[in-house]
């Protein structure tokens, strides 16, 4: 049986700010449990709803050298929807009313998280064949695996996959600050490794040292090899083109089933879609103060208002 660990800064239903949480919450439960043991590890934020905290059970704790101090690392565990979830607990780093805060503080706390994930694994009775890292917040996991965790039988042979959900956000900080907190040596701060300009770059570290790289579509995989879309990392993307794959995010057919979805006005299915779905169109027209017209073309987009999401293309087509 193959063992896979998803490492992420967010995951539904526990904590969500964007689409990353949907992917990390939905994909693990889609693996065939006869062949794959897929688990997820993420921070235990104080801003998580109490109902999720109440499900967590103490697993273990230890102290870890980090940024010149001995830091507490607690590990909690729960099983939800057939998937085992681990939560890294540290009130110093994960207390607050939202998961992401001030930029420099986020850099430090996710460096802590990445090191804590690897430090905790030998105590969890779970040795993954693959660690699947998501976005810049987990970018140092592949780096640490090649550095301070490279020795010993436990970590030998563990592979990493780095998935880019949004290349724009990379986890940059000044090189000296980056070195001091991460504990990484000067060796890693060259332009072919973690350095970009005057900064250390967490995402770049993951992209350099991961065994494979994925992103959210074949089109995006090609786009990020270009200077226009590459966010300063297009050269690295071209260099790693043989290891880069685009995989389109799927749909959760349980949560987004219109026949059972309690969040729509009228539920429908394959047999009655033409009769029933129109009621939802009328409802949103009424809610938005629009003319209720069954023949009026409507486009609905669940998205952030950013140029990355293609709103310029919609405006162009409308014109």
Predicted regions: what they are:
Residues 1-319:
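Catalytic cores of nucleotide-sugar-dependent glycosyltransferases that transfer UDP/GDP/TDP-activated
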């Amino acid at each position: 049986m193959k063992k896979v660990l998803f490492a992420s800064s967010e995951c539904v239903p526990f904590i969500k700010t964007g689409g990353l949480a949907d992917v990390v919450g939905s994909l693990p439960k889609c693996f065939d449990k006869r062949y794959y043991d897929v688990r997820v590890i993420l921070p235990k934020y104080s801003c998580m709803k109490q109902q999720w905290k109440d499900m967590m059970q103490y697993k273990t704790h230890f102290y870890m050298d980090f940024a010149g101090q001995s830091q507490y690392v607690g590990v909690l565990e729960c099983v939800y929807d057939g998937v085992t979830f681990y939560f890294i607990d540290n009130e110093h780093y994960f207390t607050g009313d939202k998961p992401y805060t001030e930029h420099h503080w986020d850099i430090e706390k996710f460096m802590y998280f990445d090191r804590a994930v690897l430090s905790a694994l030998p105590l969890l009775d779970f040795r993954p064949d693959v660690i699947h890292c998501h976005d810049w917040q987990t970018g140092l996991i592949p780096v640490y695996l090649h550095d301070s965790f490279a020795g010993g039988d436990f970590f030998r042979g563990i592979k990493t996959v780095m998935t880019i959900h949004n290349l724009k956000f990379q986890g940059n900080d000044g090189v000296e600050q980056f070195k001091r907190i991460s504990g990484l040596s000067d060796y890693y701060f060259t332009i072919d490794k973690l350095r970009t300009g005057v900064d250390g770059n967490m995402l770049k570290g993951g992209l350099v040292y991961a065994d494979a790289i994925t992103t959210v579509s074949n089109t995006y995989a090609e786009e990020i090899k270009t200077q226009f879309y590459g966010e300063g990392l297009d050269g690295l993307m071209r260099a790693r083109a043989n290891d880069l794959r685009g995989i389109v995010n799927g749909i959760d057919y349980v949560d987004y089933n219109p026949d059972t979805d309690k969040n729509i006005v009228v539920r429908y299915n394959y047999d009655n879609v033409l009769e029933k779905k129109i009621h939802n169109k009328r409802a949103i027209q009424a809610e938005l103060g629009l003319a209720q017209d069954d023949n009026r073309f409507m486009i609905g987009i669940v998205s952030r208002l950013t140029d990355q999401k293609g709103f310029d293309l919609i405006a162009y087509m409308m014109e």
